[in-house]
């Protein structure tokens, strides 16, 4: 079994709060304070979960620099109180950074989900490009 440290548990909680504040800020018509707070919590929680060195390594790989620049640029734009533009940049950066993870996640959801329609939908979204 995988052992999880106390710092990783705290990181999961902080990341969850970050996602909550980002979604809540989006629901409140792109409230810049909530979005900025959510961004900071999300990035802090991510670094607590996987560690500072691995976080730096993930974001600054040569083939991920474009996505990283859009994501971090979006965070800066949100902090400068331009939330709509910042969230568009962040969304593009997020999909650019995590595009290799989506087929794996959809494949997992397709296997776990017992509802026939949703299982077939997730398996179709998985496609043929798998990281395994």
Swiss-Prot record:
Cellular component aspect of the GO annotation: cytosol; endoplasmic reticulum; Golgi cis cisterna; Golgi membrane; membrane; nuclear envelope; trans-Golgi network
Membrane topology designation: Multi-pass membrane protein
Pfam families in the cross-refs: Got1
Cytoplasmic side, ranges: 1-9, 53-68, 122-132
Entry's transmembrane regions: 10-30, 32-52, 69-89, 101-121
Localization (cell): Golgi apparatus membrane
UniProt-listed GO biological process terms: endoplasmic reticulum to Golgi vesicle-mediated transport; protein transport; retrograde transport, endosome to Golgi
The keyword Protein transport is annotated on this UniProt entry: yes
Keywords: Golgi apparatus, Membrane, Protein transport, Transmembrane, Transmembrane helix, Transport
Lumenal face of the membrane: 31, 90-100
Similarity section: Belongs to the GOT1 family.
Function comment: May be involved in fusion of ER-derived transport vesicles with the Golgi complex.
PANTHER family on file: CGI-141-RELATED/LIPASE CONTAINING PROTEIN, VESICLE TRANSPORT PROTEIN GOT1A
Name of the protein this chain belongs to: Vesicle transport protein GOT1A
Origin species: Homo sapiens (Human)
């Amino acid at each position: 079994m995988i052992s999880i440290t106390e710092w990783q548990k705290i990181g999961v909680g902080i990341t969850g709060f970050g996602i909550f504040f980002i979604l809540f800020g989006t629901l409140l018509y792109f409230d810049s304070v909530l979005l900025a707070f959510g961004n900071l919590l999300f990035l802090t929680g991510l670094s607590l979960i996987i560690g500072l060195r691995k976080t730096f390594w993930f974001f600054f790989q040569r083939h991920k620099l474009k996505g990283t620049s859009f994501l971090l640029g979006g965070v800066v734009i949100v902090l400068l109180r331009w939330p709509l533009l910042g969230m568009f940049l962040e969304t593009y950066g997020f999909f650019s950074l995590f595009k290799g993870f989506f087929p794996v996640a959809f494949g997992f959801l397709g296997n776990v989900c017992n509802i026939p329609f949703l299982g077939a939908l997730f398996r179709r979204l998985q496609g043929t490009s798998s990281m395994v």
